[in-house]
């Protein structure tokens, strides 16, 4: 790959090169670089479940009035636009259109924080595609209000279990 095949993105830890065609961002790239364990990508059912949780959180939180109209970087987002764009983007992920954008190793350490950021970055990028920038939406979804990053992996796995017809005991 040449330098033109990358874009520079910055977070609180510094700047990294991210593939120019990637829908994910710097935090996902950092996880890929830091956790090169198996070389595998997350399983399709897990990606589907993460997107299902993100979609549900966006729609329910809109209904509960937890999303507000926001002005970010000169762009106006109504609460309804925000919720609908996140839900639509999550549906595209659920349909399997963007499986190649989920690149965090399934065996990475932790409670799923890197998988959560991978999902947030991809969904935010898709949700804001018409505007050309994903940063404003990413800052607005911030965990999709009420859906915590440490709960995403267990919630997602529970959704997979239900979807696959597995009995879940608590």
State the predicted function of each range:
Residues 1-149:
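Conserved, well-structured ligand/cofactor-binding cores
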Residues 134-170:
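N-terminal low-complexity segments that are often proline-rich with Ser/Thr-Pro
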């Amino acid at each position: 790959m040449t330098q033109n095949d990358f874009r520079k993105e910055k977070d609180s830890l510094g700047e990294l090169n991210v593939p120019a065609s990637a829908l994910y961002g710097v935090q996902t790239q950092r996880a890929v670089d830091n956790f090169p364990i198996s070389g595998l990508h997350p399983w399709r059912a897990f990606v589907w479940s993460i997107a299902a949780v993100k979609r549900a959180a966006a729609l329910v939180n809109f209904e509960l009035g937890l999303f507000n109209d926001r002005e970010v970087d000169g762009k106006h987002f109504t609460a309804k636009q925000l919720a609908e764009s996140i839900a639509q983007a999550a549906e595209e992920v659920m349909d399997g259109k963007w499986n190649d954008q989920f690149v965090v190793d399934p065996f990475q350490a932790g409670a799923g924080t890197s998988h959560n950021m991978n999902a947030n970055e991809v969904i935010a990028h898709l949700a804001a595609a018409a505007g050309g920038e994903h940063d404003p939406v990413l800052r607005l979804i911030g965990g999709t209000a009420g859906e915590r990053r440490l709960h995403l992996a267990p919630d997602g796995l529970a959704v997979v279990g239900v979807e696959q017809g597995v009995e879940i005991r608590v």
